[in-house]
Swiss-Prot record:
Pfam families xrefs: Ribosomal_L36
GO CC term, one of those recorded: ribonucleoprotein complex
The protein's name in its UniProt record: Large ribosomal subunit protein bL36c
Organism: Porphyra purpurea
HAMAP family the record matches: Ribosomal_bL36
Subcellular location: Plastid, Chloroplast
Main location: plastid
């Protein structure tokens, strides 16, 4: 899980979602997991 000031899609399978007021990226590739904060 990467924590970044700006999250973006790294591939076409990445999905941007909001959980508990946090913007997150979920993907089949675990290296692409990101959280904004």
């Amino acid at each position: 899980m990467k924590v970044r000031p700006s999250v973006r899609k790294m591939c076409e399978k990445c999905r941007i979602i909001r959980r508990h007021r946090k913007v997150m990226v979920i993907c089949n590739n675990p290296k692409h997991k990101q959280r904004q904060g």
